[in-house]
């Protein structure tokens, strides 16, 4: 079965997206999630079906979540955050003098 879905991006976290049924808008998304997500920014609408492939999400999981809870939250890909948080002097230790 096909579903028309609206996809919103988070202003708080890069590459975090919220999928909702277009007909429901954001009505079924828990208020606590919206607080953590930030004010949703509409990215685009998409027709989803089991035959459609998504780049980073399992289409069956997305459709199941849309049916059961009314939304699907796509988390950002894992990063090597530890490198970004090291002090500058540690990052430069191996630089040539």
Curated annotation (Swiss-Prot):
The residues covered by the YcgL domain are 3-87
What the entry lists under PROSITE patterns is as follows: YCGL (PS51648)
- From which residue to which does any coiled coil extend? none
Source organism's superkingdom?
Bacteria
What protein name does the entry list?
YcgL domain-containing protein PSPTO_3921
Q: What is the lineage of its organism?
A: Bacteria, Pseudomonadati, Pseudomonadota, Gammaproteobacteria, Pseudomonadales
